[in-house]
Amino acid sequence: MAASAGGRAGGSAGHSGGVQPEPITATPPPLPGRPVLRQSWRDLTFLHWRVEADVVTPLLPAGTRPDVHDGTSWVGLVPFRMVDAGAARGPGIPWLGSFPETNVRLYSVDEQGRRAVVFRTLEAARLPFVLGSRAALALPYTWARMRVTEVDGVVTYSSRRRWPGPRDATTRVVVRPGEPLAPGYALADFLTARWALHTRAFGRTLHLPNTHEPWPLRTAELLELDDHLLAACGLPGVATRPPDSVLFSRGVRTTFGTPADARAPRPGTGRATGA
């Protein structure tokens, strides 16, 4: 199965209501608050499909709405290797902080206009990391048996969920990374230049900012896809068609800032809205 890397300069994101979303930038804004976590993301593949915004809306946390590019929202399947996760001011945690991971993610805007991702699942191969992340931020981490291999320029990811179910939440992705992607691809920036996540935790919608260097993106050819994760995340039928965008990156080193209530105003605005 082959697919392209995604369009160059599509239409700008459109929104039917709410505060105008912040501009999309390939470089990060200043990290608000103090840094709390640091981790490296390596050998990532980004598979993305168009989905109608009304399909995404019920899957997002309160106080957010679907982010839209070229008339639709998007869902991403992103397998990669987590490396040296740990506290921002200390070394990465040996063994525990390095493992394969696969995310299913959506694209959101909050009532302050901040763009982010929303994770439907984060499949990870380290049970203590899964349990800690669920307890600390109610992130939807799940324990999975996962492998990432690279042979003769072909990268293979395979994952099977272990806990909590369903056990048939599996995925297998095989790609061949291509040439470096030149700057200026509007869709690539929309899908990857995300400087926060939104999550629902302890009765609130949280905004968790992050920062890292610009993504070193490459084109990629999708050689094989057998996915059941998207359906398990409430998106049946999406993975039965080829993705609309396929990208690859050798990775970045990222730092997360302090989570805050998504209703809180951005610095300097003095404005908060209900969620």
Identify the role of each PLM range.
Residues 103-275:
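Internal, well-folded beta-alpha domain core
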Residues 1-15:
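Compositionally biased, low-complexity flexible segments
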Residues 17, 27-32, 90-94, 98-100, ...:
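Active-site-adjacent core segments of small-molecule enzymes
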Residues 72-124:
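Extended, compositionally biased
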Residues 17-88, 238-275:
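Hydrophobic, proline/glycine-rich low-complexity stretches
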